[in-house]
A protein has these predicted regions:
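Conserved, well-structured interaction surfaces
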Residues: 1, 7-43, 57-70, 75-89, ...
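Short coil/turn linking the two alpha-helices of tandem helical-hairpin repeats
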Residues: 40-42, 47, 87-88, 106-112
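Outer-membrane beta-barrel and related beta-rich outer-membrane complex signature
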Residues: 45-49, 134-135
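Short linear capping/connector segments at secondary-structure termini
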Residues: 50-57
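An aromatic- and glycine-enriched ligand-binding surface/loop that stacks and positions planar moieties
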Residues: 77, 83, 96-255
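Contiguous mid-protein beta-loop-alpha structural module that forms a pocket-lining wall or clamp
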Residues: 93
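Active-site beta-strand/loop architecture of penicillin-binding DD-peptidases
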Residues: 249-271
């Protein structure tokens, strides 16, 4: 499961000094918290595992979401102080700031407002927004954040690194390229969620030049006005009709009605 990989559990009994064990355990608890944030957000009540199961325990019952959230938050309050802060943690590892951000997300998603405020107060002011060049081209700044050369930029709270150089690790395309293509497709809902440059959603902004009528946008006749006057981050996130890749015009040849593609599946340096 991509929501709860077992690899976060099975390494818990490696012999090591007590302080190092505490540090690694704290990082693992933060990662487990992130997984349970995802699991409870999608499925609500799920089995809550805090120890290796025997064969007889394999069919674990569900635990109520509220109980999981309370337990996860208490774990984080106890263990986060044992995690190194940004600047002292090794590159690609959990940091206190990232763990507090995870804690804040869980609390926020579950209406635990005081816990969310307390968690985010440990993050605000500890990191800064990414800026490249002279800072005037915000579209380029946003896209540059996701390039390999900036993978340790100050804006990145939790950086996932590959051990490498394994086959396919870190590459934009997998070792095979075939269906289903929906994994790289950006939906029209995602496109339409980006506001116009006046800060208003497309159904309220006078700057929106597209059509809001159902069926107005198709693969054969894309609504090109839909992409004008929009938040620059849209073109830093999605490959849209009219954009260029490696000197070639993208003509929305994906077998999908949205005609948009998630940007990360194109070679970043070429877009």
């Amino acid at each position: 499961s991509t929501l709860f990989p077992y690899t976060t559990l099975f390494r818990s009994r490696v012999p090591m000094e007590a302080d190092k064990i505490d540090g690694y355990k704290a990082e693992a608890i933060a990662l487990r918290a992130l997984m349970y944030c995802n699991l409870t957000s999608v499925f609500r009540d799920v089995p809550y595992l805090t120890k290796p199961l025997t064969l007889a325990e394999a069919q674990a019952p569900k635990t109520e979401r509220a109980q999981i959230v309370s337990s996860v938050l208490e774990d984080l309050k106890t263990w986060i102080p044992k995690i190194p802060v940004i600047g002292k943690a090794k590159t690609g590892r959990m940091t206190q700031e990232a763990a507090y951000a995870i804690m804040g997300r869980i609390a926020l998603f579950n209406q635990r407002w005081d816990d969310a405020i307390a968690a985010y107060q440990n993050v605000i002011g500890k990191v800064q927004l990414f800026k490249s060049g002279d800072g005037s081209d915000y579209a380029a700044n946003f896209a540059d954040l996701f390039k390999e050369k900036n993978e340790t930029a100050a804006e990145v709270l939790l950086s996932v690194h590959y051990k490498g150089p394994g086959l396919g690790e870190g590459s934009c395309f997998g070792v095979c390229w075939s269906g289903p293509m929906n994994a790289i497709e950006g939906t029209m809902n995602l496109c339409d969620d980006f506001y116009c440059i006046d800060g208003l959603p497309i159904d309220k902004s006078p700057l929106f030049k597209g059509s809001l009528e159902s069926g107005a946008h198709t693969k054969e006749n894309p609504d090109m006005g839909r992409y004008e006057n929009r938040d620059p981050r849209m073109k830093g996130t999605l490959m849209l009709p009219g954009m260029e890749w490696n000197g070639k015009l993208y003509t929305n040849n994906l077998p999908a009605s949205s005609t948009a593609c998630i940007h990360k599946w194109y070679t970043p340096e070429d877009t």
